[in-house]
Amino acid sequence: MAKKIQAYIKLQVKAGQANPSPPVGPALGQHGVNIMEFCKAFNAKTQGMEPGLPTPVIITVYSDRSFTFETKSTPASVLLKKAAGLTSGSARPNTVKVGTVTRAQLEEIAKTKQADLTAADLDAAVRTIAGSARSMGLNVEGV
């Protein structure tokens, strides 16, 4: 028989840098999950990723206090800011442009994100990422 699910916890944790301090500790502690066990497993799973990139994770907590987790790819906005060399997007994206990204950069980001996007092919994924870039106040070249 399958285990009974007690809760789903959604967090963004920096790749390879999970530790018991907030936000990880309190979120897992209130469900009785072994925090250090999660931190070790998460850090091991994200070892191949670039350290420090925020990584969304969905933790499924079961009634016997065991857990499983699934990591997603880094948010597109973070990857776009990194590609454009910015710290934040534009406060007024339609009037003030703060940077530029090329089609090659968009394709690289789309390849990274394609597993988490609903796009049918790479070109559709590039257009989705280009829309995110425009909504952040970035000029998009070649799309």
Swiss-Prot record:
One GO MF term attached to the UniProt entry: large ribosomal subunit rRNA binding
Disulfide bonds: none
One Pfam match: Ribosomal_L11_N
InterPro entries per record: Ribosomal_uL11, Ribosomal_uL11_bac-typ, Ribosomal_uL11_C, Ribosomal_uL11_C_sf, Ribosomal_uL11_CS, Ribosomal_uL11_N, Ribosomal_uL11_N_sf
PTM statement from Swiss-Prot or TrEMBL: One or more lysine residues are methylated.
Family annotation (PANTHER family): 60S RIBOSOMAL PROTEIN L12, LARGE RIBOSOMAL SUBUNIT PROTEIN UL11M
Quaternary state and interactors: Part of the ribosomal stalk of the 50S ribosomal subunit. Interacts with L10 and the large rRNA to form the base of the stalk. L10 forms an elongated spine to which L12 dimers bind in a sequential fashion forming a multimeric L10(L12)X complex.
The protein's name: Large ribosomal subunit protein uL11
Species of the source: Ectopseudomonas mendocina (strain ymp)
Lineage: Bacteria, Pseudomonadati, Pseudomonadota, Gammaproteobacteria, Pseudomonadales
